Amino acid sequence: MELICYVAPGWRPRIRVAEPSRPWMDDTPESYAYRCLPLSIANSHGWEILSPCTFAVRWHGAAEASSLEIDLSEAGSAEFVPQSLLGSGILTIHVEGVLRTSPGWNLWVSGPPNSFKDGIAPLAGIIETDWSPYTFTMNWKVTRPGEWIRFEENEPVCFFFPIPRGGCDQFEPRIAPMSEDAELEAEFNDWARARLEFHQKMHREAPENPSDRWQKLYYRGVLPDGKRGIEDHEIKLRICPFTGRGSS
């Protein structure tokens, strides 16, 4: 599968494989947040685009584009700097590249998952990048007028990953009683009993080793009886970095 970032002369996008760590997860007691495998997988499930410069924004609350003030005093010599184009407190960051995916694949684009910035939130979009010759922008919406919000140079400002076009349309969702799937119901009941017993044991006598304080069934990809759930269970992603160089 291909994912290419085509660049024009002077474009130097700062793209890296997404980082799995988050400062707030580091700060949880014993970094326990990393025990949640879905969080860690989501954090690293794609690529990040980094800010080309340090800047700060403040929205004065009006709908006009001029109501968003952008301080570029620390932007240095960055050629592509954030702008206020759309109004309503929306900050626009240009992506220096035309991204091209294999046929039938879109890109999901937003801010880094499980990462929070006080006073501003990333917007999300899905782009048909297998045919479009157009660039796109990463946009953030200020949620707290009157406050300065700072972005550092090389701070992740965009996160993207490929998704198959039409994937959701192929599903026929429904709600059903668990008794409809006898095997699933039995496995769920086994897990529920084991989970209750595990927590009761932890309450009676907590183990000294922090890793023994959680069951790790899902993390290890095993069913309640210890058998593997699937062969391709993922604990860590091995995403390739972008290679090559653009025009000078």
Where are these regions (language model features)?
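Aromatic sugar-binding surface patches on proteins
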Residues: 132-139
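Active-site-proximal alpha-helical scaffolds that flank and shape metal-associated catalytic sites
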Residues: 115, 139-140
